[in-house]
Amino acid sequence: MKKLLGLALVAAVVAGTVNAGERVGDFALIDHQGAIQHMAWYNDHSAVVIMPMTKSQDDAASLKALQETYAEQGVQFFLLNPGLHSDRALVQSEVAALGLDLPVLMDDAQLVTEMLGVSHIDEAVLYDPSSFELLYRGPIADIEASLKEALAGEKFEMVSVASNAPAIEFANLDAHANLSYEKDIAPIIAENCASCHRDGGIAPFAMDSSITVQ
């Protein structure tokens, strides 16, 4: 049931894996405490940083330092559980053991992880929540320069840095490749996204054409 609910909330799957200059697409996931985290709600923030859950103390320390420095400047931080396991209590204990206090997005179906192009366990992403444009993808240790540029209002091409961390195992690639827009995606958008992504809605853009949906 959790995987089905997660799938229903991920309208952004229509975008596929993002490239430089492309929008990430809006999405929503349930976090490890059972709360829905809808990315459109953060469009008043300066930036959003998402990093997969990690057992690396160094990566956790880097993320914590960034949070302590930039959260007060309007940067929202999330951890992402890319289908590693669905036990929320275990996730909570693992996060606490790393000294982190962040919402963990439970991507049981791995759709958001795929859509963001995250393929390694230390591969963080940075995006502009007002435009949903991806600005950085790579190790969390190398993200700060891009974050500073984003906060300064600089315009730049997406920065992509290679990762040497363990790869994320994707169990559902074949199933996701066979998704139908008409049968699988359009009903999700109509039920979960259209009320916000419309003229006058709270989302940053209206889903009123095939281009904006993609």
Where are these regions (language model features)?
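Electrostatic cytochrome c docking/interface patches
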Residues: 170-187
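Short active-site neighborhood of thiol/selenol oxidoreductases, capturing the structured segment around
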Residues: 41-59, 186
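The canonical Cys-X-X-Cys-His
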Residues: 124, 189-200
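Short, internal strand/loop/helix patches
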Residues: 25, 94-128, 134
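Non-catalytic, surface beta->alpha helical segment in thiol-disulfide oxidoreductase systems
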Residues: 129-151
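Structural microenvironment flanking redox-active thiols in thiol-disulfide oxidoreductases
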Residues: 58-98, 108-114
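N-terminal "domain-start" segment that seeds a small globular fold
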Residues: 18-40, 58, 182
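Gly/Gly-Pro-rich "capping" loops immediately C-terminal to redox-active cysteine motifs
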Residues: 135-141, 201-214
